[in-house]
């Protein structure tokens, strides 16, 4: 089976993304319109898709640099990143803006719904972007999501340098379509995000092979990884098509499932694994993550994943 990347040089990953404080409420059910609901429990965690994916990459063995912005109330987020081995020198601390945060409801089934406040995540400046990219070369990779501003400029700067770009278009909205998507090297996304990029109406039944095939037709030079929840994941890269089932566990909290998968898949590929090997490792890591409470704290270390038996 083809190995996409042979790691012959020292490469770095720049995760230019969000840094959030997560307020997680344990509830019997998601609150409805007009309803006042008492939470059974409140926990405060570090979060943000950018932070989660940086931690997943680092715990999976990659040299990871995080760029982004926080307010003075978010200094503890830097400690979490540093503890995971992520370089935080490129995170800007803003005195007059609050750190981004998320209000997360977790129900009895382990599902969640999330309200985001952008805060410092929406205060990225072009000057900061210019400063960040001074530290990277065409040997390096950029990972982005959709929780910060200035994404088109970030992609432009990365391409000027010659970096390869990995996109996780979450949360999905019209801003994603403002990006030069034909310049993306890796797409990691779920079926809903994929259908929105394709301007498809949601079908009665999700066909991962069909949807990923349409994406591959639209972006033939990119590697497409489509996550399908309980149905696993599929990947198309060149002429290769691979399917991966999930590892079944008791679900506690799905918040970091996708972020864990993203980090571990990318780390696997860049460390020379085949697509199948990288998908299998990512699925194991994601299974461990959903069996635990919290976002960043639930992301496993590589040693745990390698020892995992279902």
Residue ranges and their predicted role:
Residues 31-39, 190, 242-245:
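Short glycine/proline- and charge-enriched loop/turn segments
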Residues 3-7, 174, 205-310:
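Conserved phosphate-binding/catalytic region of the ribokinase-like
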Residues 20, 71-74, 108, 119:
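Short, glycine/serine-rich, charged loops/turns that create anion-binding
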Residues 24, 115, 196-198, 289, ...:
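Residues that scaffold the ATP/ADP-binding catalytic core of kinase and kinase-like folds
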Residues 7-16, 79-93, 105-242:
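Ribokinase/PfkB-type carbohydrate-kinase core domain
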Residues 6-33:
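Positively charged, low-complexity intrinsically disordered leader regions
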Residues 19, 49, 260:
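Active-site metal-binding loops of divalent metal-dependent hydrolases
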Residues 4, 13, 33-101, 303, ...:
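Substrate-binding N-lobe of the ribokinase-like
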């Amino acid at each position: 089976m083809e190995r996409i990347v042979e790691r012959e040089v020292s490469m770095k990953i720049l995760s230019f993304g969000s840094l959030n404080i997560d307020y997680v409420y344990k509830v019997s059910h998601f609150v409805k319109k007009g309803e006042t609901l008492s939470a059974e429990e409140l926990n405060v965690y570090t979060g943000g898709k950018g932070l989660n994916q940086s931690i997943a990459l680092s715990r999976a063995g990659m040299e990871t640099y995080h760029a982004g912005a926080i307010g003075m109330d978010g200094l503890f987020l830097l400690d979490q990143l540093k503890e995971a081995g992520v370089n935080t020198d490129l995170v800007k601390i803003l005195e007059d803006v609050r750190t981004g945060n998320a209000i997360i409801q977790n129900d009895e089934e382990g599902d969640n719904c999330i309200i985001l406040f952008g805060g410092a995540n929406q205060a990225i400046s072009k000057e900061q972007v210019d400063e960040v990219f001074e530290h990277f070369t065409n040997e390096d990779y950029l990972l982005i999501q959709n929780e910060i501003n200035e994404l088109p400029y970030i992609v432009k700067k990365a391409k000027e340098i010659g970096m390869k770009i990995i996109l996780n278009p979450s949360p999905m909205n019209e801003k994603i379509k403002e990006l030069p998507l034909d310049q993306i090297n890796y797409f990691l996304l779920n079926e809903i995000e994929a259908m929105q990029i394709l301007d498809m109406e949601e079908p009665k039944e999700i066909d991962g092979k069909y949807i990923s095939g349409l994406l591959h037709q639209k972006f033939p030079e990119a590697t497409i990884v489509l996550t399908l929840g309980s149905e696993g994941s599929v990947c198309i890269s060149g002429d290769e098509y691979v399917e991966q089932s999930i590892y079944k566990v008791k679900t506690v909290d799905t918040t970091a499932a996708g972020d864990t998968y993203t980090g571990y898949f990318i780390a696997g590929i860049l460390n020379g694994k085949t697509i199948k090997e990288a998908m299998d490792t990512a699925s194991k890591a994601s299974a461990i993550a959903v069996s635990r409470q919290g976002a960043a704290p639930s992301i496993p270390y590589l040693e745990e994943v390698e020892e995992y038996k279902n």
